[in-house]
UniProtKB/Swiss-Prot annotation:
Lineage summary: Bacteria, Pseudomonadati, Pseudomonadota, Gammaproteobacteria, Pseudomonadales
Protein name: Alanine--tRNA ligase
Keyword set includes Nucleotide-binding: yes
EC number: 6.1.1.7
Entry's localization field: Cytoplasm
Residues binding Zn(2+), per UniProt: H562, H566, C666, H670
Reaction catalysed by this enzyme: tRNA(Ala) + L-alanine + ATP = L-alanyl-tRNA(Ala) + AMP + diphosphate
Biological source species: Marinobacter nauticus (strain ATCC 700491 / DSM 11845 / VT8) (Marinobacter aquaeolei)
Amino acid sequence: MKTAELRQAFLEYFQQQGHAIVPSSSLVPHDDPTLLFTNAGMNQFKDLFLGREERDYTRATSSQKCVRAGGKHNDLENVGYTARHHTFFEMLGNFSFGDYFKREAINFAWTFLTGEQHLNLPQEKLWVTVYAEDDEAFDIWNQEIGVPAERIVRIGDNKGARYASDNFWQMGDTGPCGPCTEIFFDHGPDVAGGPPGSPEEDGDRYIEIWNVVFMQYNRTADGEMLNLPKPSVDTGMGLERIAAVLQGVHSNYEIDLFQDLLKAASDILGGAATTEASLRVVADHIRSCAFLIADGVMPSNEGRGFVLRRIIRRAARHGNKLGATQPFFYKLTGALVELMGEAYPQLVSSRKQIEKVLLQEEEQFAKTLDKGLRLLEQDIAELKGTEIPGETVFTLYDTYGFPVDLTNDIARERGLTLDYEGYEKAMEAQRDRARAASKFGIDYNAAGITIEGKTEFTGYDHVDGHERIRTVLVNGEERNAEAGDECVVVLERTPFYAESGGQVGDTGLLTWSGGRFQVTDTRKEGDNHLHVGTLIEGELFPGLEVDARIDHARRERTKRNHSATHLLHAALRNILGEHVTQKGSLVDPDKLRFDFSHFEAVTPEQLREIERTVNEQILENTPVDIDITDMDTAKEKGAMALFGEKYGDVVRVLTMGTDKYSVELCGGTHVARTGDIGLFRITSESGISSGVRRIEAVTGLGALEWVDETERTLRETARLVKGTRDSVVDKVKQVLDRNRQLEKDVDALKAKLASSAGTDLAGSAVEVAGLKVVASEMEGADRKALMETADQLKNKLGEGVVVLATVEDGKVVLVAGVTKSATNRIKAGDLMKHLASLVDGKGGGRPDMAQGGGNDPSRLAEALAGVPAWVEQNIG
């Protein structure tokens, strides 16, 4: 049975058992800061297990794409060297959310594995483990399924703590957990290794193929085990592992899927043997890299993007080891799409984007790969022990872009280790340990403050209202506020929009008889809107009724900018490609800022087209439609959900533009018609990190003011160059041309002066051990003049040493030169280090030319006077 057929057979079997087939979730976990990547099938169901979420099914099955290459679950260093470690794998799973439990879960698994209509594995080849205290699971296996007791192994707490066991599963330090039962396949006595729980269990004879977790608890941060609302089941079976069993091979790399990838990689790399560890690395890594890029991850120097960069660079290095001299990795995308595109259509739609990102990253790394390898080879050759120094590891990382695990790969091949402690010390100096301050100034959870209730937001339809105060907080404490206090007010209902989705919070006033509270910001804490500000006069206390009114003009400007971001997002996807996804935004009354995934700078032509497209949609003046519906209906309408945003069962779908140009989920405030935006102008485009671009723009009166300012600048420029609006470009070109010619004339004059100065200074040379030595200060010269004069002098002296200096803005500037024929006797770089230290500075360079500087001009004359003596003492 081929891998693709096995995947389909699994899903269809559980569908027949009443399970809903749920598509794989993204590799980027939604709204779960505890996970770097999706690494198990249950990740997308976490809130269901915790009872925080309900869906219209209680049984589910999926084939979940997973990545383990960072954080706690990190298989990267083993990939390519073992039979079963991968950065990317598929996890087959079936799940029960308070529906069936142990008996049904065990029966489902056994029937699929051993049933004649299914996988038909020989029962005598299967072993089972259970948690030592789980008598119920043991009895089901032994008495109901019929597995002999000698093939059922009880595993206790074997990791040094209560519930720390191979058979007590937990996703992380916190979260859903419970006892589990595992099914193992026995490859037979020809393979080394003992059954699970034995001293020889790490051998390859007995391989775990299915883990069935009985989800009973939620582990809190303090280690407490709380019962889940409903006992549930989470199972996982690695697709690649069970495929290897069915196809009668011992290594995952021997299954049909990997054999096809290895063959394609071998063809690209000129016929490398498919058994090569480096080729297995390449075949494995194309899967994780392609799927991560398809899910919106871009190479960068932090977080998920850095893990992706590490994997790409590891693949590039192993390709280099196999003889690749040009980018090759991106070429493997086509083979992967052919093999997995049917099961994962996003691979097909993202193919060009994947290839572009991989090619760009390969080309970037190629610039430093050879240099870094040479440095490492040199250090290894000079190594006296078996440990590569931490300073070398850090230099490779910091200067040449070598992730530490890549350096470890190379060390491992040579039987060497890394000095991790030294590396960490080197990293310490530049590691930014700053943590962003709490978004709200006060961390209410940490402070133990619970704000009861829920604020009803009325601001979609109203800009004011007569409301009642529920809570007043002064310095984080619940108490009445007096005039002058800075505090937080929570209303039962409010027209004030709280900051979320990139849109800033409203400002305005709360007023009542004898009192006034200035709202300077509105923020969200759970289900409550926090009105932050200053009590101008009167007293604030719970139960007080106030008139709440937002700054309406400010809200209107913000609405224009927010609606424009939706049109901009749609235009970017239409013009640059569907790989564009929102990475962040800021919408305030003055401007909009939109961050998005894209692998290169947006060209001026593309920016003009984007701007024109948005303005065309504005001019159409179509209504902005808002539909309140459920998530499934919203998806059917093609609504875009933004990464990082948490949506409930009921969502707000915003549609604007002709032919539903933009359809997004959004809880922000917006204009009624696109024409209300008025005008849209892009003010800047830039890169903020690898693979992420930023556009800033203005709308409405802000756009008009920007146009006016641009016009004023143009008129002033025209006046300065004595031209008109129409001729200003030609006039500026003429000024620049004249300036360039003047610079050439000045350079020529400086060259003549340098030649003349060189002739004069040559006469002051003193002879030291057969070398002519010149050391002189050139007042009024700059660094370039010093360099040119030094070159002139070297030509005139024949064989000698030149030191020239000047003082610019209170700082010493130094240049040292040694004629080529004399560099075997004395080095300009060594001389410069000595001189610079005398004037409180630093310097260095090549044997024939060096530069430096210093902070103490008062010691310059003494330093120059000592040059002949230094040459005499240090000449070789």
